[in-house]
Structures are given as structure tokens and as C-alpha cells.
């Protein structure tokens, strides 16, 4: 009995002939592991299935959060799901319920705020951020999001107010640095200087004084930099001195070639700092003393090394245009114009091997940078003009062109006060290789010169070249509208909508309608809608037509000039809008366009809920359809189910017809006698 107790004894304790490692065991376990089950993809055939699915999911989520209210992940998953369903009010309600449970959850606040920002609900996001920083003022992430949002919206004054609220809590260094960067971005250097003063009082560490000094070095004067370093040394005292502060101070003086001042700073620091705290200071002082040699010689060595590197790369691939860009920038920093020209000339000599535009895209920028350098840096205007000319000769315009080259050449001529040459360049471009971008650039040039007659001519040529471009017609009409020539604008719109090959005709129609509505020509707008409805029965056109009728003011309202006061919709406007809805409903009913009919009824119901009486609302509600499941036979004798709409009005008409047929049948059976 005793021998059976405990683990069996190992008789042979020698190592096994085949050793198995833990890695091998793990690999075999993973290889033999069965794949995890994946949930099948759900697809919804209709709204009824979707609503059923949504109700089921909501019940599941409510069960989760009811069982474990303190688990914020359940709440956030619930709210995220509602956001995916575009149910923003439900999502807000869920977030607020979660905040009632745990108002200090940073992750929950962030999710809530980001959901509002993502959906561009700015005021909601602002209110949430205000609540968050009030409840949790020590959480920097809320403040960062707050100031980022305000600055993104262009509310700089509001951003400053948020920063000031934040600074009253004396946050860490990152917050102060963010405030300073804000003022630097908007060139408010005095404000930034005042913030640095408060910053160094709250956080007097040496690195912060160095930041202030570098700020003054970049935006202030050398005297201000010295004043900052002096204040830092005086404030820190000998107990809190740091070698980094003195190194930065000395490097600043050396940068200004004040070598004696720098040497004095090094000696002052070495005399007062212990050896254990001044190792880097000793090294910096040694390097400083070695820097009295020829600095130009050192720079030449560095430049020569990089030149050799670039030359080796270009030997491997002479058409590596990125290397040519870097090589040219290197020579530009060296300041030798002859070397720069030599590199650019060698670079532009590497013409792409094929006449495919994708091979020329990078190459063409070599010409652009070369011409700009000659004009701006070398001040050689004639050579820059020659570069533009040679580049335009080189491009195979019959196969492709680069509008940017033509436009840059024209802009160069304008900078040289040669307007005729600029016009000649752009005219030549349009004649050789017309492109929409060229037309736009030429028209913008003439518009800036207030040459509106030339603008008209260019628009006419563009439309003649490409009449299918909807934007050309719209821009042309907008030009005439800006010149207060409504008749010409109207004529252009008329020509535009008559074009059979427009790429986006709906944009031209919309612009024409908006133009007439802006001009107050409401009868013309109605005529346009009627003409458009002759071409299409799109439900959006009908809905927009009805909305237009709602917004049309009466004659008495047009005479009064009280634009600030919002007026109620008149009964006549409601009548006109209902007439449009009724016409549309009749059309869709006759053509059996059920989807469009449902969308129209939804818009009609929204209109009645906003402007109608309870009787009108009841009337439209009675017309709303219901979804039913039907079956239909396929070609292979199988049946499939589909969802269809059943309209109450159609059911009533069918019922009435059935009653008439039944009465006729009874009359026939009774031999012509009327049976009640």
C-alpha cells in the first residue's frame, strides 16, 4: 500500500537521447491549436431587421451596464455602438449616465469629448471640456484638448482665456511651454516674455531659464539674453547652480564671437561648482579653447565629405532626382554660385528616358528650383527667363504638359513688370496644350488686374474647348453676377443647363436656382424647378422645391427690411409647399416609385410637424406606409422573400374597388335586381 503512494520513482536518471526545448513545446501547441470561431457577417435586408437588431443590441448593452455599473468599458462600448448607428442623442444620454456613475473617469471624458468633436458638435465639445476642467483641473489632457480645439477654430482670445485658467493651477512645464508656443505662433513676443517670467517663478529649474534665454536669442536682443542669464544665476544662487546653464550662456557668447566673455563665464562657473558637478563644463571649456582654429576649413572638410557621398550615389543612378535636390541644396548653403549652377546644369541634363508624365514629375522640379534660385538668390533675371524658356521647349507638349511651369513663367514675367510677356506665355500655353488649370490661372491673373473683358473672353474659350466642365459655367456666371450683370449671368446659366454632356449637371442647376433665389426672382425659380422636373423625377428635386416654397416671403415681407427678426411661415407659403408635396406624391404613386414615395412622405411629415396643424399631421400620418414581407417567383421556379411597402391609401382604393365588383356580381346573379 505504501509503495503506491506518491509519484513513481525514476530508475534511469540519465539524460534522454532527444532533448525537447520549451520553445519546441510551445510551437507544437500553437501549431495544433484550432482556429478561433469567428462571428458570421450580419447583413440587413430592410429597416425592420435593422430596428430589430438595434433593439436587441440595446437590450444586451443595458443588461451589461445594469449588471456592472462601475465597468466604464461597458458604457463606452454602448455609446460607441450608438455613435456607429448615428444615434447621437442616445450616445450623449449614455455618456451622461456613465458620468453620473463615475465622474472622475478620464478615459470616459475623453471618449465623450472626442465623439462630439468628431461629429463637429463644437458647442457640445466646448461645454464638455469646460465641465471636465472644472471637475478635474489637474488632468492636463483635458486642457490640451481644450486649447487645441479653440485654436483650431481660430478663437485665439478664447484659447488665451483657457490657458490663463490653466496657469492659475500652476501646472507642469509642458503646459507653460504650450502657452508660450501659442504666443510665438502669433508673433505675440511680449506676451510670451511675460509668460516666461511667471513660468520661471513657478518652475525655477535651470532648463526653463535656458528656454527663456533661447527665446530671447531668437526673438529678442543679445542684451535681453544676457539679462535672462544674469537673472537665472542670481535667482538660483550657488546652492542650485547647474553646469548646463553656464554652458548655454558661454555658447551664446561664443556664437556672438565674444570669446573673452565666454571664457570669463567658464572660469566663473568652474571656480564655484564642485568637480563632481562640472564634468560636462570642463569638457565644453576644452572644446571651446580648441575652436580658435580656422572654422572655414572645418566646414570645407564636411562639405567635401558630403560631396563625395552624393557623387557616389549619382554614379550608381544618375537619374536619382532626390539626390540631385540634396546636392543642389548643399551647394546653395556653401554660397558658391558657380558650384550651384554646375550642379543644376548637370541635373537638368539627366532627361527622363521615356515620354511618360510619371517619369517627368520629379525631374521638372529641378528646372523650377533652378529658375527660382537664379531669380531670388543669384539675382540673375535674364538667366532665370532663359531657364523657363528652355524648360518649356524641352517638354513634349503634344503628349503632356505641366501647367505649373507655364504659370510660374507668367508669374515671373509679372514680377518683372512685363504684363504683355505674361499674357503671351499663357496665351501660348492655351493654344498649344489647353488645360483647365491653365485657364483658371490665366483668369485669376486677369481678375486680379480687373480686366473683366479678358476674363469673359477666356471663359468663352474654356467653355468652347471643354463645354462639359460644369465648374467653368458656374464660375463664368459668378463672374457676371459679381459684375452686377444679372442678364448675362442668366444667359450663361441657360446655355450651361442646355449642354447635353455636362459632367455634373446637377451643380449647374443648383447654382442657377441659387442665383435666381438670391436675386429674388422667385417666379423664375419656380420655372426652373418645373423645367428640371421635366428632365428628372428625382425625389430630392421635389423636396427642395417644397422647401423653397416655404422660404419664399410674401410681397408685404419683401418691402419691409427687418432681416434680423425671424418671420413665421405664412399660410400661403404652406399651401404652396403642400401643393408641391401632393404633386410629387401623385407622380410617384402613378409611376409606382415606392422608395421615392416613402422618402417624400418622410419629408412631408417633417414639414407638417414643423409648420402644420394637428389635423394636417394626422392626415399625413395616415398616409405613411408599412413594411411587409412578400414572396415572388424566380425564373428557376424558386421563391424569394423581399420587403415591400404597403400604403394605406392604396389599400383603401383596392377595398373600394372590391366592394364595387362584389355588388356587380350579386346584381348579375339576381338577374338585374338590386339586392341590399
From Swiss-Prot:
Comp. bias (Acidic residues): 554-566
GO BP, one annotated term: mRNA splicing, via spliceosome
Compartments, record wording: Nucleus
Highest taxon, organism lineage: Eukaryota
Functional summary from the UniProt entry: Involved in pre-mRNA splicing and cell cycle progression. Required for the spliceosome assembly and initiation of the DNA replication.
GO cellular component: post-mRNA release spliceosomal complex; Prp19 complex; U2-type catalytic step 2 spliceosome
Annotated signal sequence range: none
InterPro entries reported in the protein's UniProt record: HAT, HAT_Syf1-like_N, HAT_Syf1_CNRKL1_C, Syf1-like, TPR-like_helical_dom_sf, TPR_rpt
Organism: Aspergillus fumigatus (strain ATCC MYA-4609 / CBS 101355 / FGSC A1100 / Af293)
Keywords (A to Z) from UniProt: mRNA processing, mRNA splicing, Nucleus, Repeat, Spliceosome
HAT repeats: 52-84, 86-118, 120-152, 154-185, 187-218, 220-255, 257-291, 301-333, 335-369, 379-415, 417-448, 450-482, 484-518, 520-551, 572-610
Name this polypeptide is given: Pre-mRNA-splicing factor clf1
Keyword Nucleus among UniProt keywords: yes
Ranges for region Disordered: 554-573
Subunit structure: Associated with the spliceosome.
PANTHER family on file: CROOKED NECK-LIKE PROTEIN 1, PRE-MRNA SPLICING FACTOR
Annotated Pfam families: HAT_Syf1_CNRKL1_C, HAT_Syf1_CNRKL1_N
Record family assignment: Belongs to the crooked-neck family.
Amino acid at each position: 500500500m505504501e509503495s503506491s503512494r506518491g509519484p513513481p520513482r525514476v530508475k534511469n536518471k540519465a539524460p534522454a537521447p532527444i532533448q525537447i526545448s520549451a520553445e519546441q513545446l510551445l510551437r507544437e501547441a500553437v501549431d495544433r491549436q484550432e482556429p478561433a470561431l469567428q462571428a458570421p457577417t450580419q447583413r440587413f435586408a430592410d429597416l425592420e431587421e435593422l430596428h430589430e437588431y438595434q433593439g436587441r443590441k440595446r437590450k444586451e448593452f443595458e443588461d451589461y451596464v445594469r449588471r456592472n455599473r462601475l465597468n466604464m468599458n461597458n458604457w463606452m462600448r454602448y455609446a460607441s455602438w450608438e455613435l456607429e448607428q448615428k444615434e447621437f442623442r442616445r450616445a450623449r444620454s449614455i455618456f451622461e449616465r456613465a458620468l453620473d456613475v463615475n465622474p472622475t473617469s478620464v478615459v470616459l471624458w475623453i471618449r465623450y469629448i472626442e465623439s462630439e468633436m468628431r461629429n463637429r458638435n463644437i458647442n457640445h465639445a466646448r461645454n464638455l471640456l469646460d465641465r471636465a476642467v472644472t471637475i478635474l483641473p489637474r488632468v492636463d489632457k483635458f486642457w490640451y484638448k481644450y486649447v487645441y480645439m479653440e485654436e483650431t477654430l481660430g478663437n485665439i482670445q478664447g484659447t488665451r482665456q483657457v490657458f490663463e485658467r490653466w496657469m492659475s493651477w500652476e501646472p507642469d512645464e509642458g503646459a507653460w511651454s504650450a502657452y508660450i508656443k501659442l504666443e510665438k505662433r502669433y508673433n505675440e513676443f511680449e506676451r510670451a516674455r511675460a509668460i516666461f517670467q511667471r513660468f520661471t517663478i513657478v518652475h525655477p529649474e535651470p532648463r526653463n531659464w535656458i528656454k527663456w534665454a533661447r527665446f530671447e536669442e531668437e526673438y529678442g536682443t543679445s542684451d535681453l539674453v544676457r539679462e535672462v542669464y544674469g537673472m537665472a544665476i542670481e535667482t538660483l544662487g550657488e546652492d542650485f547652480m547647474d553646469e548646463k546653464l553656464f554652458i548655454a550662456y558661454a555658447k551664446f557668447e561664443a556664437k556672438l564671437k565674444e570669446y573673452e566673455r565666454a571664457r570669463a563665464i567658464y572660469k566663473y562657473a568652474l571656480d564655484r561648482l564642485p568637480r563632481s558637478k562640472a564634468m560636462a563644463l570642463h569638457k565644453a571649456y576644452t572644446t571651446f579653447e580648441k575652436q580658435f582654429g580656422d572654422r572655414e576649413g572645418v566646414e570645407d572638410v564636411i562639405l567635401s565629405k558630403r560631396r563625395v557621398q552624393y557623387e557616389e550615389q549619382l554614379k550608381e543612378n544618375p537619374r536619382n532626382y532626390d539626390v540631385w535636390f540634396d546636392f543642389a541644396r548643399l551647394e546653395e548653403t556653401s554660397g558658391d554660385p558657380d558650384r550651384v549652377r554646375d550642379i543644376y546644369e548637370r541635373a537638368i541634363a539627366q532627361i527622363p528616358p521615356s515620354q511618360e508624365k510619371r517619369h517627368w514629375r520629379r525631374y521638372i522640379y529641378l528646372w523650377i528650383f533652378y529658375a527660382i534660385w537664379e531669380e531670388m538668390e543669384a539675382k540673375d533675371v535674364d538667366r532665370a527667363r532663359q531657364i523657363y524658356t528652355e524648360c518649356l521647349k524641352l517638354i513634349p507638349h503634344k503628349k503632356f504638359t505641366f501647367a505649373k511651369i507655364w504659370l510660374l513663367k507668367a508669374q515671373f514675367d509679372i514680377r518683372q513688370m512685363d504684363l504683355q510677356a505674361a499674357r503671351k506665355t499663357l496665351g501660348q500655353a492655351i493654344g498649344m496644350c489647353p488645360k483647365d488649370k491653365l485657364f483658371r490661372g490665366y483668369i485669376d491673373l486677369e481678375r486680379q488686374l480687373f480686366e473683366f473683358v479678358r476674363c469673359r473672353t477666356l471663359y468663352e474659350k474654356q467653355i468652347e474647348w471643354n463645354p462639359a466642365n460644369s465648374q467653368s459655367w458656374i464660375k463664368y456666371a459668378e463672374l457676371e453676377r459679381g459684375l452686377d450683370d444679372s442678364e448675362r449671368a442668366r444667359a450663361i446659366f441657360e446655355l450651361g443647363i442646355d449642354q447635353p454632356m455636362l459632367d455634373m449637371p446637377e451643380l449647374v442647376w443648383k447654382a442657377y436656382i441659387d442665383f435666381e433665389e438670391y436675386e429674388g426672382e422667385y417666379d423664375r425659380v419656380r420655372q426652373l424647378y418645373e423645367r428640371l422636373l421635366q428632365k428628372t423625377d428625382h425625389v430630392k428635386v421635389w423636396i427642395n422645391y417644397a422647401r423653397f416654397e416655404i422660404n419664399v416671403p410674401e410681397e408685404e415681407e419683401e418691402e419691409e427690411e427687418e432681416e434680423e427678426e425671424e418671420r413665421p411661415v405664412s399660410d400661403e407659403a404652406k399651401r404652396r409647399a403642400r401643393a408641391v408635396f401632393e404633386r410629387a406624391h401623385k407622380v410617384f404613386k402613378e409611376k409606382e416609385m415606392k422608395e421615392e414615395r416613402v422618402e417624400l412622405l418622410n419629408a412631408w411629415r417633417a414639414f407638417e410637424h414643423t409648420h402644420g396643424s394637428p389635423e394636417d399631421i394626422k392626415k399625413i400620418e395616415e398616409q405613411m406606409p408599412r413594411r411587409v414581407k412578400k414572396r415572388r417567383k424566380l425564373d428557376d421556379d424558386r421563391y424569394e422573400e423581399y420587403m415591400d411597402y404597403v400604403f394605406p391609401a392604396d389599400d383603401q382604393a383596392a377595398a373600394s374597388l372590391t366592394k364595387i365588383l362584389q355588388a356587380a356580381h350579386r346584381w348579375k346573379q339576381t338577374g338585374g335586381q338590386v339586392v341590399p
